[in-house]
Regions:
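Residues that define the transmembrane beta-barrel architecture of outer-membrane proteins
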Residues: 44, 74-80, 118-124, 169-175, ...
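Outer-membrane beta-barrel translocator/channel fold
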Residues: 46, 52-70, 93-96, 141-175, ...
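Transmembrane beta-barrel strands of outer-membrane/channel proteins
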Residues: 48-56, 107-109, 143-151, 193-199, ...
Length: 408
């Protein structure tokens, strides 16, 4: 029953994430500026794509090096991707603000050539890409990120899959970043090839959570649907925002697992623990694509500093704890934030340090990576992850945010 509830939560989250990507009538960002000329241009351009992505699995554990049922290395992967995307037309405000950006949803099939122990998962994800540099009239250097959920993993099981200590859940996050050479071979056709990085994990919601990392290549084709401008055609002038300060308020929550190491024994604390937090960040909008600022962060973690309140002297067996006082599980800090701004989505990164805390678990630096998905002009979904001390997995950050004084 608990597994079913977790699956339903992840499915609902994924639906909420991709819904704005396909709802092209967002009040937030699709105010259209029609021109009074005799030429009609589509306000939304659609495209379909197909990718093949071979990869090398980074060897992070003995399971991948041969300590598995096959008794051989697991170091190869292959995936097939089918994608739908749209771009805002050159006559729309967003098309003039972000003339080379596309976004959409994709479905992919992955194999690691170990179906019994890892499975052959299927991913559903949102994605977005844009141009980094125009190299030649028909050749550009682009980037593309993918973010979603992957289903159908074979997870760790003490009896049936005891050596797989990398995957602790049947559903895992799928994160990918690629850099591509994009060649316009025809008015309607593009060829793309490049390199990418992929990460699979469950966000510390289940143990084990070793995760899987892939370095690979990719080659694909894209077919534009309907009318499109020919390469070198004249487009309307770009729009540029005026620099200004906006304010982001985010409220989030999640659950997490917690393990303890003591007396040379590694133990998993039974059950899940709640996490809740709030961020308030004044952000200076430098240009169309970038804003940065300082965020005041507060977080309560129900699993923090439990080690100090353990009942008994041993780390093995049935672990029990007294409930720590609130001050031991609450922390406040400041973080530097930078954000890549695009239509529909923004990517936020932060590095911070707790200033008000009590206990080792809340001491020191923390790092944040978050995806913001706009639902209205000011309201956005927040899906993030937090690390502690630059290396320790901490918790998901699933919530809602609101932007004040947005002059875009």
């Amino acid at each position: 029953m608990i597994r079913n509830r977790n699956a339903i939560r992840l499915l609902c989250l994924l639906c909420l994430l991709v819904h704005p990507a396909i709802n092209v009538n967002l009040e937030a960002q699709t105010i259209i500026g029609q021109r009074n000329d005799s030429v009609s241009h589509p306000l939304i351009r659609h495209q379909l794509g197909f990718d093949i992505r071979p990869g090398y699995i980074v060897s992070t554990h003995s399971f991948l090096q041969g300590d598995n049922a096959q008794q051989k290395k697991i170091d190869q992967s292959l995936s097939f991707h089918f994608k739908y995307a749209f771009r805002f037309g050159k006559e729309s405000n967003l098309g003039r603000l972000f003339p080379h950006t596309y976004q959409g949803i994709g479905v992919s099939y992955h194999t690691f050539f170990s179906p019994v122990e890892l499975g052959n998962p299927v991913s559903v994800y949102a994605f977005q890409g844009s141009r980094i540099a125009q190299l030649l009239p028909r050749l550009s250097l682009d980037y593309e990120w993918n973010f979603g959920a992957s289903f159908g993993w074979k997870k760790y099981d003490e009896l049936s899959n005891p050596q797989n200590v990398l995957v602790g859940s049947k559903i895992n996050a799928y994160i990918n970043l690629g850099f591509l050479l994009n060649w316009q071979v025809h008015r309607y056709w593009k060829l793309a090839a490049g390199v990418d990085l992929t990460h699979f994990s469950n966000g510390n919601t289940h143990y084990p959570n070793g995760g899987l990392n892939v370095i690979g290549g990719r080659i694909g084709i894209v077919r534009a649907l309907g009318a499109d401008e020919a390469p070198g055609s004249i487009t309307p002038g770009w729009l540029f925002i005026k620099p200004h300060v906006s304010y982001d308020l985010v409220i989030y929550g999640a659950t997490r697992k917690r393990g303890l190491i003591g007396d040379d024994v590694s133990s998993l604390i039974p059950g899940s623990f709640g996490v809740a937090g709030v961020n308030f960040a004044p952000m200076y909008n430098f240009n169309n694509y970038f804003r940065a600022g300082l965020s005041a962060d507060a977080q309560y973690d129900e699993s923090a500093n439990l080690k100090e309140y353990r009942v008994g002297e041993f780390y093995s067996g049935d672990l029990k704890f007294h409930r720590p006082p609130f001050r031991k599980q609450f922390a406040m800090g400041l973080s530097l934030r930078a954000e890549l701004v695009m239509p529909v989505f923004s990517i936020n990164v932060g590095v911070g340090r707790n200033l008000i805390y009590s206990g080792d678990d809340t001491k020191g630096f923390y790092q944040i990576l978050a995806l913001k998905t706009y639902v209205t002009r000011h309201l956005f979904l927040h899906v993030g992850y937090q690390l502690s001390k630059f290396k320790d997995p901490s918790n998901l950050m699933l919530g809602l945010g609101y932007r004040f004084h947005d002059k875009r």
